[in-house]
């Protein structure tokens, strides 16, 4: 997408663009799937991470952060993975999506952290490392999720990584009216 493209209007925040559904080439797909209880999709695949894991070890860095970066970078390189529906029910296109991941906290279960995407790996790594090593003891484990729900812009990719656990597919809960 580029400025002036005929099927979106720019939001004042310049991070998301409101799609004109009537002029959108995916209008029919959207109309078909929009009423599904779970219209989300997830991709589960096996990836050989041997070289990436070795590179992280050699650099004395977190393989987990290498992995998060690879996932969020890939999502940002594919336009179709940056479309969302906002709290007003409008389809929006985000210039950038961040990543949310649960981080294990000693003595507790986990803490959900939103890590901003930066194309520059070093900047991403430094900020992500600072965020996951400075989780407040008395913080809300679902704070990042609650902020997303309040703002109504789901400009993120959700990723849970469980080290050394083999599985071929997983889905997660999705809060919706009536199940609460």
Describe the role of every protein-language-model region.
Residues 7-8, 13:
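Aromatic (phenylalanine/tyrosine) cluster motif
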Residues 15-44, 64, 154-180:
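Flexible, Gly/Pro-enriched loop and linker segments at secondary-structure and domain junctions
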Residues 36-54, 95-123:
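Acyl/amide activation-and-transfer machinery of modular secondary-metabolite enzymes
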Residues 61-99:
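Hydrophobic "lid/gating" helix adjacent to the active-site nucleophile
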Residues 105-167:
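Helical lid/core segments from catalytic subdomains that handle acyl or acyl-like groups
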């Amino acid at each position: 997408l580029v400025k002036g493209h005929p099927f979106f209007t720019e939001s004042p925040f310049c991070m998301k663009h409101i799609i004109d559904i009537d002029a959108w080439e995916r209008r029919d797909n959207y109309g078909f799937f929009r009423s599904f209880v779970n219209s989300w999709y997830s991709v589960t695949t096996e990836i050989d991470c041997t070289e990436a894991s070795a590179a992280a070890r050699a650099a004395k860095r977190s393989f987990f952060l290498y992995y998060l970066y690879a996932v969020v970078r890939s999502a940002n390189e594919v336009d179709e993975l940056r479309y969302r529906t906002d709290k007003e029910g409008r389809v929006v296109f985000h210039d950038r999506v961040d990543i949310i991941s649960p981080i294990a906290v000693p003595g507790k279960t986990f803490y959900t952290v939103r890590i901003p995407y930066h194309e520059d790996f070093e900047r991403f790594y430094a900020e992500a490392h600072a965020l996951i090593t400075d989780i407040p003891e008395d913080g809300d484990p679902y704070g990042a999720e609650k902020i997303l729900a309040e703002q109504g812009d789901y400009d993120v990719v959700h990723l849970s990584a469980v080290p050394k656990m083999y599985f071929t597919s997983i889905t997660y809960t999705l809060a919706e009216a009536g199940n609460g």
